């Protein structure tokens, strides 16, 4: 038997492992039923003074059966762009709630269902397995960017949760009962890291990663997901509106640090894919697939002419940017309530 490594050496290996896989932090991407992951329920966000709610989302309390005091209930589903903010009131959903209370009274409530790195399929699963039973008046789905950029950096399979390849590797590493002793890897951080990166390399080869065909498959899977959401919306019990989120590639003039948000190669890819997604939204509307309980809006250019430095990376924005988004969502709520009343 090999001598056991000293504790300090083992700790060094763990630190290296966690450093290499910091984007899989279980505190912000904790396993969740149906949706792959959300925040770790009731845990405090790192270096922040707020906690996730009992479901792993950024609310002061998670929604339950709707009380009579809630005269308006709005759900905002999305990714980490909804998590940004010093306190709930500083997030996009929190700022939206403030605006809706001014328009509709104290009974207006907005709930934040932003999960860091969530893609559209995960958002659909959340709506159909949890949210549709909670009597919302309006559901917003703010997304698009994660479906585009995460296959570039993480799991290359279009429409998959970004860390699925790592989950597959972990499951096979620990729970594959068919492996014989001579086939099993030594239980170590080094072997696990090699297994995960090896699977990623294999998947990239199998999917023709970063090829033209692969780019179009990313768009195709996103379009299929949107169409599924459209078909499901009739049974959700509340109008659903998909909003294509803003991206730095749609800003005409990038100010200060905005100019260094990402590499030129990646920004060119993001620009191509956003153009294609915009065309997808146009086709849905032209084909009559975005009407009634399911509608779509393109908010990607909401900051196009803004001369302020608003983006902190390719999709996250400053507090000023979050306020612009919240104001726009308040207008969207007003429009959806009118359409719902007419319908």
Spans of features found by a protein language model:
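Second-shell loop/turn segments in exported
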Residues: 80-86, 112-113, 212-219, 267, ...
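Structural beta-sheet core signal
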Residues: 76, 141, 242-244
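Serine-dependent acyl-ester chemistry module
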Residues: 4, 145-282, 305-308
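Conserved beta-strand elements of the Class I
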Residues: 73-77, 111, 139
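Proline-aspartate-enriched helix->loop->beta-strand connector
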Residues: 131, 135-140
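Histidine-centered active-site loop/cap adjacent to the catalytic His
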Residues: 222, 310-343
């Amino acid at each position: 038997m090999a001598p056991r490594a000293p504790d300090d050496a083992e700790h060094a290996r763990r630190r290296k492992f966690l450093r290499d896989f910091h984007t899989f932090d279980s505190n912000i991407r904790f396993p969740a039923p149906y949706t792959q992951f959300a925040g770790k329920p009731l845990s405090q966000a790192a270096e922040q003074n707020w906690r996730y709610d009992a479901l792993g989302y950024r609310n002061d309390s998670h929604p339950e059966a709707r009380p009579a005091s809630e005269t308006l209930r709005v759900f905002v589903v999305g990714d980490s762009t909804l998590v940004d903010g010093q306190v709930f009131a500083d997030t996009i959903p929190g700022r939206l709630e403030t605006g809706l209370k001014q328009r509709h009274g104290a009974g207006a409530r907005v709930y934040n269902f932003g999960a860091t790195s969530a893609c559209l399929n995960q958002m659909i699963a959340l709506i159909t397995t949890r949210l549709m039973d909670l009597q919302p008046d309006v559901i917003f789905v703010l997304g698009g960017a994660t479906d585009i950029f995460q296959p570039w950096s993480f799991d290359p399979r279009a429409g998959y949760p970004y860390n699925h390849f790592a989950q597959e590797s972990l499951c096979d590493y620990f729970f594959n009962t068919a492996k014989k002793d001579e086939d099993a890897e030594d239980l170590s951080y080094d072997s696990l890291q090699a297994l995960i990166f090896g699977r990623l390399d294999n998947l990239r080869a199998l999917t023709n990663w970063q090829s033209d065909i692969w780019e179009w498959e990313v768009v195709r899977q996103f379009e299929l997901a949107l169409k599924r959401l459209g078909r499901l919306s009739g049974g959700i019990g509340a109008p659903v509106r998909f909003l294509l989120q803003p991206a730095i590639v749609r800003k005409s003039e990038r100010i200060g640090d905005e100019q260094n948000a990402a590499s030129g190669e990646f920004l060119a890819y993001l620009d191509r894919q956003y153009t294609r997604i915009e065309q997808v939204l146009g086709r849905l509307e032209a084909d009559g697939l975005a009407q009634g309980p399911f509608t779509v809006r393109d908010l990607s250019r909401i900051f196009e002419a803004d001369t302020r430095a608003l983006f902190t990376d390719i999709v996250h924005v400053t507090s000023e940017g979050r306020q612009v988004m919240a104001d726009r969502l308040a207008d969207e709520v007003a429009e959806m309530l009118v359409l719902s009343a007419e319908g």
